[in-house]
Amino acid sequence: MKRVHVIDSHTAGEPTRLVMEGMPALSGRTIAEKCDDFRDNHDAWRRAIMLEPRGHDVLVGALYCAPESSDASCGVIFFNNSGYLGMCGHGTIGLVASLHHLGQLTPGCHKIDTPAGPVSATLHDDGAVTVRNVLSYRHRRRVPVEVPGYGTVHGDIAWGGNWFFLVSDHDMTLELDNVEALTDYTWAIRQALEAQSITGENGGVIDHIELFCDDREADSRNFVLCPGKAYDRSPCGTGTSAKLACLAADGKLAPGQVWTQASICGSRFEAFYEREGDGIRPSIKGRAYLSADATLLIDERDPFAWGIASP
């Protein structure tokens, strides 16, 4: 019987499962190299932790790792039901809240190593967390893609720790009761991007699709389709970072000016940025709440010990 110690939380509605113990040791000097080893040699563990019957398609995993740099508090590898993430904003907030629960982090600023590079996270006295994300930038503006059944869709391609296609010009209603139609629309966009070989810089796969509309209580509301075809319940930290990169490139948001991003569920992140080189350094503020401190059991006799995978 294998045992995996996890801490579950949610950040603005989006769940994170922090894996503390029970995983095989990963080889590699950097967090990116450890992520490669996880992907190439231990992916069954991702499936066991993320897929049914222990997980679900909305869940994001965060593997706690020793840091690669001497001044970092820890390292982390993010993953979900379909694969691995370079960075995850809501997951970093969940990581910090969970480590605080375990007594491993105190209020203050902490450096965290991720596959996409180092980030810093400030745990505030009231429990909120501000993540200073990786360098973010817009790669291309108003890119047309022909989407079967929907016509030509224009969107910006931007990096916020993952690759995003950001669409503001659309006829969709961003409400919870319209999630099925929103999922169909954004999935069709993602498939069209792949079919037409539209990518991020250096061929990076655009695996997040983000729609925007006006919101009465925030600067914007979004709907984010994640790589595994689930939608983000939170406003999406890396997606908000990509949005800020586009706003900055268009001269619509000044450095230090706060942008309030609402999710499809109504939860909110506060964000601002600093200019850095040809891009920006975004900061995202949100809050996570703990939901479980548990031990997952993996019984080798169980036919679904390593998850129920789609064919």
Swiss-Prot record:
Q: Which residues form a coiled coil?
A: none
Where's the active site on this chain?
A: 88 (proton acceptor), 236 (proton donor)
Q: What class of enzyme is it?
A: isomerase
InterPro entries under this entry? Answer: Pro_racemase_fam (IPR008794)
Q: Which GO terms describe its molecular function?
A: 4-hydroxyproline epimerase activity
Q: Which residues bind substrate per the record? A: 89-90, 208, 232, 237-238
Which reaction(s) are listed as its catalytic activity?
trans-4-hydroxy-L-proline = cis-4-hydroxy-D-proline
Q: Which UniProt keywords apply?
A: Isomerase
Q: Which cysteines are joined by disulfide bonds?
A: none
Q: Which Pfam families match?
A: Pro_racemase
What Enzyme Commission number(s) does the record list for this chain? 5.1.1.8
Give the protein's biological function.
Answer: Catalyzes the epimerization of trans-4-hydroxy-L-proline (t4LHyp) to cis-4-hydroxy-D-proline (c4DHyp). Is likely involved in a degradation pathway that converts t4LHyp to alpha-ketoglutarate. Displays no proline racemase activity.
* Family membership: Belongs to the proline racemase family.
NCBIfam families per UniProt: PRK13970.1 (NF010577)
Question: What's the protein here called?
Answer: 4-hydroxyproline 2-epimerase
Kindly list the organism's lineage.
Bacteria, Pseudomonadati, Pseudomonadota, Gammaproteobacteria, Oceanospirillales
